[in-house]
Amino acid sequence: KTLAVSVRAKEFVSYHCSCCGHCCRHIENCVMVESLDAYRMAKHLRNQHCGISSTDDVLLRYCEPMPLTDEGYPIYVLKTVGADATCIFLRENQCSIYAARPRTCRLYPFSVGPGERGRDFEYCLCFDDNQQHHFNSGKVLVKDWLYHNFPKEDKEFLKQQYLVIPEIGRLMHRMPEEMRQAAVFKILFYHYYHFELDQPFLPQYDQNNRSLLNELRKLAPSE
């Protein structure tokens, strides 16, 4: 179980990474792989000559699909291996894709959510079963951690995501149940598969969202 406590950017928190790999274990269905994550992972692994040439390859080899909502909104999570549900990318207690690790991993032990009262984002410190390993020494200034691990591209991606996800949810809720499987396939296509690795991510994501909403509106009856 994870306890999330709201923090401000100017706060100091006790945290120290000892490179023990504990936060990479017991993570089954825990680490979401978002569109931007899959794109970065694919580019990184392609450059490492790992037999990866597209986001499709990454998602098939390293991720599992799962529904996030009752309507079946699809997401991907990292695959795990072994009895202790270890991240598929953990090698000798080190992340083998560290430079392209998912945002969830880069921000740990913090998380980001939609902001309130005029703020773009809210930040939380996440306490979990690894508390004994990470939260007993060291000091981290929240804004410094975010500066290094939450770049502008991530912020712009999340702003777009926060705008489009509620609309997708409303459209899926209005759809006849027999249309939802078709909607799931369209979401997977436009949010995960329809990307060129040699083109910038954000313009593609923006266009994909426009195309996706147009397709979903055809499946949902007018109000």
Stretches with model-predicted labels:
Residues 1-223:
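Short loop/turn segments that flank or connect secondary-structure elements
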